Amino acid sequence: MRPGTAVVLALAWLVAFNLRSGFIGLGPALPALTVDLGLSFAQAGFLVAVPTLMMGLMAVPGGALVDRWGPARVITAGLALVAVGGGLRAIAPEFVLLLALTFLFGAGIGVSQPSLPRLMRSRFPLRLGVTTGVYASGLVTGSIIAASLTGPILDRIGEPAAWRLPLLLWGMLAGIALIIWTVVMRPWCAEPAAVGSRVPQKQTMVAGWTPWRDRQAWISASLFAAQGIVYYLLVAWLPAIYGEAGSSATATAALFAVFNAATLPAILLFPIWSDRLRRRRPPALAAATLFLLGVLGLLMLPLADPWRWLWPALAGSGVSGVFAMSLVLPADIAPPGRTGAAAGMVLAIGYAASALGPVIAGVVRDVTGSFDATLLLLPAIGGLMIALSALAPERSPTQVGD
């Protein structure tokens, strides 16, 4: 007996949560880790960069694997890598082993992510927006909880080696998720990948189709890349931007919290709205417009009361809404049996571009001596997101399952 709708959605949320918690949880632990192992800042930077790199590099092979073996099996393998690689980081005695385990951990994330769009299309082909919003909220929740709890855990222990405990905790949670996933999804793992599709097996692989030659796939990938650039740029530098504008440390923390808090409702609401409309373009356009308004306010009136609280809320909800809509699109554009390939291509290009956001902003800050040029870059990319949203695939979510 295959698991029901609520169970599959709960499991997808749990998987998504564990694809982010161990990744984001490293950031607050990095200063203690650097001191304890005697690392250079460059070495510490590699530990943060590798998971993002692997999310991009492993997305394409992950998409191919899920189209071949099905989402249940690939997620099982990916979660195993996340649990083992992520958890064993906690006992690594030196940098080389820690880096190798981080590669393993990142590979698990990269392989698993294309499986989630395929899972949603195979089980919920008429409700892709709602179901994508559910698992995407798991990504955001995992990030928020890991970022919020890791610091207090370190403070509570108060020792140089305290960084090991939160990494072990996130690894153990991934292991628990793996056990739950394997037990509940075992009947599905035993089926051929195409079982459950609403089309015959011979129709599930469309000969000659590849996302790399598909215009809609490139538009979707470009939209995902644009939102990724500005999101990771703001996550890295928004506190510094506020500080340079004259904000106090307390106010800056509160404004940054508003930005992060605004992402969670948006990541659910925009995909749900798209299902109700049976269209993707209007919600994507609305989200991109909210982001543009937010960064224009940040550029012109960053600390003016009461508007300063509105700008990060608009920017956070807007970029999160575009992120969620970008995750829906691969399942819309791909022919039956090729959702994994489409998702892999979109994620690979998107995460490769996302890694450039913080770097570009840092280089511009070094060259110009201020964040003014970076603030001009944000609305430019916001305008690009609006243009790409206007071109986004406008396909009613009525396609067959995968």
Task: Locate the predicted segments by residue.
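C-terminal transmembrane helical hairpin of 12-TM major facilitator-type secondary transporters
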Residues: R280-L329
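Helix-to-loop junctions at the C-terminal end of transmembrane segments
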Residues: M58-G70, A266-R279
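Helix-loop-helix hairpin linking two adjacent transmembrane segments in secondary transporters
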Residues: L126-V130, V134-C189
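A late C-terminal transmembrane helix in Major Facilitator Superfamily
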Residues: A331-F371, L378
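Extracytoplasmic gate region of multi-pass secondary transporters
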Residues: L26-G27, R215-I267, P271
